[in-house]
């Protein structure tokens, strides 16, 4: 989340973001005022959960010549008719 807006006065923001968090202040603070950032993340216990997904199935490039850029020389079944080695180098 990035903002290039100018905020004056007291600004309160709350909610959840999908990352730990950062704060950046650029520019100069006026000499007649103050500026600060108060940042907290609950009790300090950060949990990242995994939602959804298919697990260890036959996924993108996971098959032996059957997926997109699969492993080995899987002629006819891979993307573009050639399975490739799966590393993206074109071989």
Curated annotation (Swiss-Prot):
Residues 52-91 are annotated as: Right arm (Gly-rich tandem repeats). Pfam families: Chorion_1 (PF01723). Keywords: Repeat. GO terms for cellular component: egg chorion. One of its GO terms (molecular function) is structural constituent of egg chorion. Belongs to the chorion protein family. One of its GO terms (biological process) is chorion-containing eggshell formation. This protein is one of many from the eggshell of the silk moth. Residues 1-51 are annotated as: Central domain. It comes from Bombyx mori (Silk moth). This is Chorion class B protein M3A5.
């Amino acid at each position: 989340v990035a903002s290039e807006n100018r905020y004056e006065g007291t600004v309160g923001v709350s909610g959840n973001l999908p990352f730990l968090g950062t704060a950046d202040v650029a520019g100069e603070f006026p000499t007649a005022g103050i500026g600060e950032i108060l940042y907290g993340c609950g009790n300090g216990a950060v949990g990242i959960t995994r939602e959804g997904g298919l697990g260890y199935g036959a996924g993108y490039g996971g098959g032996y010549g059957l997926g997109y850029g699969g492993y080995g020389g899987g002629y006819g079944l891979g993307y573009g008719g050639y399975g490739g080695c799966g590393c993206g180098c074109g071989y």
